[in-house]
C-alpha cells in the first residue's frame, strides 16, 4: 500500500502539535496506520543588525532570530484519510507538504 509522508514546518511549535493531533484523530477514525510525528531538528535563522540607523557612534548590534520547527508523519495513503487530510485548517505560519511514496 502507498504511504503518504506529511512534512510540517512552522515557527510556532504549538500550531504544529495541534495539526499533528488532528492527523492522529483522522488516522484513528479511518483505521489507517500512522507513524510519527517525528520532531526534526529546529533551524535557527539569525540576523545581526546595527542599532544605530546612521552608522555613527559605537558599533552596537541587535540579533534577531527566527526558529523553524519541523515534524514528519507517515500515514497509509487511504483515499478517505487523504481527503480528510486536505480539509484540515492550517494556520498561515505553518506549511504542509504531502508526498505519496510506494
UniProtKB/Swiss-Prot annotation:
One of its GO terms (cellular component) is small ribosomal subunit. Residues 34-58 are annotated as: Disordered. InterPro entries: Ribosomal_uS10 (IPR001848), Ribosomal_uS10_CS (IPR018268), Ribosomal_uS10_dom (IPR027486), Ribosomal_uS10_dom_sf (IPR036838), Ribosomal_uS10_euk/arc (IPR005729). SMART domains: Ribosomal_S10. Pfam families: Ribosomal_S10 (PF00338). One of its GO terms (molecular function) is tRNA binding. The keyword Transmembrane helix does not apply. The keyword Ribosomal protein applies. Keywords: Ribonucleoprotein, Ribosomal protein. PROSITE patterns: RIBOSOMAL_S10. One of its GO terms (biological process) is translation. NCBIfam families: uS10_euk_arch. PANTHER family: 30S RIBOSOMAL PROTEIN S10 FAMILY MEMBER. Belongs to the universal ribosomal protein uS10 family. Part of the 30S ribosomal subunit. Involved in the binding of tRNA to the ribosomes. This is Small ribosomal subunit protein uS10.
Amino acid at each position: 500500500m502507498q504511504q503518504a509522508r506529511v512534512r510540517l514546518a512552522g515557527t510556532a511549535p504549538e500550531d504544529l502539535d495541534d495539526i499533528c493531533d488532528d492527523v492522529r484523530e483522522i488516522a484513528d477514525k479511518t483505521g489507517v496506520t500512522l507513524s510519527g510525528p517525528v520532531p526534526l531538528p529546529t533551524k535557527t535563522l539569525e540576523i545581526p543588525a546595527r542599532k544605530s540607523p546612521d552608522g555613527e557612534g559605537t558599533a552596537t548590534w541587535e540579533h534577531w532570530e527566527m526558529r523553524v520547527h519541523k515534524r514528519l508523519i507517515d500515514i497509509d495513503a487511504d483515499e478517505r484519510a487523504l481527503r480528510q487530510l486536505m480539509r484540515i485548517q492550517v494556520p498561515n505560519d505553518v506549511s504542509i507538504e504531502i508526498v505519496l511514496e510506494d
